[in-house]
Curated annotation (Swiss-Prot):
GO terms for cellular component: ribonucleoprotein complex; ribosome. It comes from Clostridium kluyveri (strain ATCC 8527 / DSM 555 / NBRC 12016 / NCIMB 10680 / K1). GO terms for biological process: translation. One of two assembly initiator proteins, it binds directly to the 5'-end of the 23S rRNA, where it nucleates assembly of the 50S subunit. The keyword RNA-binding applies. This is Large ribosomal subunit protein uL24.
Length: 105
């Protein structure tokens, strides 16, 4: 199981692939397969058979998971992608900090 560098509700930017340069919010993290689900990124068409919940069926467009190595954390303050460092505050809590501007994430 690989450690994933992003968490749920983080804002990330895609750094490679067909959606390169787009930003989105992390909806789910799957550390066992080292993948993340990002809103509005990697949209795929799924052919759905009619069933009791969806009587019509048809083609449904939804997000698919992408590898976590293709995303980087996006800092709102410096408006760019960044790596993170960890810092321990005076009260003993551990926080994530932007390496470029020093803002807590």
């Amino acid at each position: 199981m690989a450690k994933v560098h992003v968490r749920k509700k983080d804002t990330v930017m895609i750094i490679s692939g067909k959606d390169k340069g787009k930003t989105g919010e992390v909806l789910a993290v799957m550390p066992k397969v080292s993948k993340v689900l990002v809103s509005g990124i990697n949209i795929v068409s799924k052919h759905q058979k009619p069933n009791k919940q969806n009587m019509e069926g048809g083609i449904i467009r939804k997000e698919a998971a992408i590898y976590s190595s293709k995303v980087m954390l996006y800092c709102e303050k410096c408006k760019s992608v960044t790596r993170i460092s960890h810092k321990i505050l005076e009260d003993g809590t551990k926080v994530r900090v932007c390496k470029k501007c020093g803002e807590t994430l």
